[in-house]
């Protein structure tokens, strides 16, 4: 029976941006980016000589990302990510803002508690407005 060393145990709390060690070097993706990757894989398969059937998990994930993606084309996805990367956001916050697209600072802070105290409402409102503009201008 093995016991964990209390020194190795870190409280995991996304609200405080505390994540397990395994996530330190991990990158985050927007749901829109995941959809783009899955769509690319699906189109590759459709154009292959021998089309293979996708797993149920793949198809459900594809449907989920199609339903919940906020950005519909590569240019808008890249533009939104670029905008968010210019801000002083943790990669978790960047992904959460890009996936949830809250409309008001209060909503953003309720959904992403780590933003509280790190951003003034006006600064956060500008970020949210910029994201909203990108969403509304996509084709």
From Swiss-Prot:
This is DNA-directed RNA polymerase II subunit Rpb4. Belongs to the eukaryotic RPB4 RNA polymerase subunit family. SUPFAM superfamilies: HRDC-like. It comes from Drosophila melanogaster. SMART domains: RPOL4c. It is found in: Nucleus; Chromosome. It comes from the Eukaryota. RNA polymerase II consists of 12 different subunits. Induction: Under heat shock conditions, up-regulated in early larvae and then expression levels appear to return to normal during the L2/L3 and pupal stages. In second instar larvae, down-regulated 1 hr after starvation and then remains low until at least 4 hr after nutritional starvation. This protein is produced by a bicistronic gene which also produces the Ada2a protein by alternative splicing. Three distinct zinc-containing RNA polymerases are found in eukaryotic nuclei: polymerase I for the ribosomal RNA precursor, polymerase II for the mRNA precursor, and polymerase III for 5S and tRNA genes. Disulfide bonds: none annotated. Transmembrane segments: none annotated. It holds the Pfam family RNA_pol_Rpb4. GO terms for biological process: transcription by RNA polymerase II; transcription initiation at RNA polymerase II promoter. DNA-dependent RNA polymerase catalyzes the transcription of DNA into RNA using the four ribonucleoside triphosphates as substrates. Associates with POLR2G. Keywords: Chromosome, DNA-directed RNA polymerase, Nucleus, Transcription. InterPro entries: HRDC-like_sf, RNA_pol_Rpb4/RPC9_core, Rpb4-like, Rpb4/RPC9, Rpb4/RPC9_sf. GO terms for molecular function: nucleotide binding; translation initiation factor binding. GO terms for cellular component: polytene chromosome; polytene chromosome interband; polytene chromosome puff; RNA polymerase II, core complex.
């Amino acid at each position: 029976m093995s016991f964990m060393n209390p020194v190795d145990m870190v409280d995991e709390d996304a609200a405080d941006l505390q994540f397990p060690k395994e996530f330190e070097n991990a990158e985050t993706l927007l749901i829109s980016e995941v959809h783009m990757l899955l769509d690319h894989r699906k189109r590759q398969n459709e154009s292959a000589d021998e089309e293979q059937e996708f797993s149920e998990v793949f198809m459900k994930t594809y449907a989920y990302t199609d339903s919940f993606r906020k950005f519909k084309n590569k240019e808008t996805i890249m533009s939104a990510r670029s905008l968010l990367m210019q801000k002083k956001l943790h990669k978790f916050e960047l992904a959460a803002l890009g996936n949830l697209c809250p409309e008001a600072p209060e909503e953003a802070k309720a959904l992403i508690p780590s933003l509280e105290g790190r951003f003034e409402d006006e600064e956060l409102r500008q970020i949210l407005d910029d994201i909203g503009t990108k969403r509304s201008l996509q084709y």
